[in-house]
């Protein structure tokens, strides 16, 4: 029973709809997450026996600032996972979720983008959850953190998130972009194609099939 609080204009709506392919029951909500009361989404989770609760880091922070303790006021025993995206989930928010929402769920901070309608890095139920961190790359994604000179960043050092190999959800071109000028500028201007021999494809190389994405300090984890 999958829920993600999202508008139709956010890519998470498309992400949510893809849950139908797994046989999941989708739970939808339209309106303010704090009306008619600040706990309305937890009311919904309890009533519908929600198993997967998706939201944003800002929502979790707002719930914390509102002083809510859903673990004391609601029956959330059906909840198995909580997902957060939109911005980095800080360590203190991890603490709040496990202290005030549920102590036995899988909390997953995820990061992707509208361009791919997917996640580059996300939760992994087979790995331990560490406060302030994202657990690992999505299936089939060659994700690395690079320095400004296009080298792998040492562990613990901030850098740019890059995906060095083609993957199924990557965009191939932009609409009304003759010669792929805007496309190449958006994805290849920073690092280009140089320095990633592992991204070479069999036969002639088509640069449109390799994506480089920089997301700044969000890769600190």
Predicted regions and their residues:
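Conserved AMP-binding/adenylation subdomain of ANL enzymes
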Residues: 1, 8-52, 66
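Short, well-ordered beta-strand segments
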Residues: 1-3, 162
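Adenylate-forming
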Residues: 7, 30-34, 48-96, 108-115, ...
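Structured alpha-helical segments in the cores of large, soluble enzyme domains
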Residues: 10-14, 60, 171
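Short glycine-biased active-site loop of nucleotidyltransferases that positions the nucleotide triphosphate
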Residues: 17-18, 72, 132
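A general alpha-helical scaffold signature found inside nucleotide-binding enzyme cores
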Residues: 36, 40, 74-77, 178, ...
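Conserved AMP-binding/adenylate-forming
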Residues: 46, 80-210, 217-220
């Amino acid at each position: 029973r999958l829920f993600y609080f999202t508008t139709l204009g956010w890519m998470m709506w498309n992400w949510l709809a893809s849950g139908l392919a797994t046989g999941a029951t989708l739970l939808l909500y339209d309106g303010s997450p704090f009306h008619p009361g600040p706990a309305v989404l937890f009311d919904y989770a309890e009533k519908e026996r929600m198993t997967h609760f998706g939201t944003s880091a800002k929502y979790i922070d707002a719930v914390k600032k509102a002083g809510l303790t859903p673990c004391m006021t609601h029956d959330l025993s059906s909840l198995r996972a909580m997902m957060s995206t939109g911005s980095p989930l800080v360590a203190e928010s991890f603490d709040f979720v496990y202290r005030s929402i549920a102590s036995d769920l899988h909390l997953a901070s995820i990061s992707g983008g509208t361009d791919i309608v997917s996640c580059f890095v996300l939760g992994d139920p087979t790995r331990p959850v560490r406060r302030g961190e994202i657990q690992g790359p999505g299936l089939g994604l060659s994700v690395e953190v690079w320095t400004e000179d296009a080298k792998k960043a040492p562990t613990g050092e901030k850098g740019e998130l890059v995906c060095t190999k083609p993957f199924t959800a990557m965009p191939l071109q932009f609409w009304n972009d003759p010669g792929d000028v805007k496309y190449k500028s958006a994805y290849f201007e920073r690092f280009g194609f140089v320095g990633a021999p592992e991204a070479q494809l069999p036969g002639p190389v088509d640069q449109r099939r390799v994506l480089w994405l920089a997301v700044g300090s969000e890769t600190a984890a």
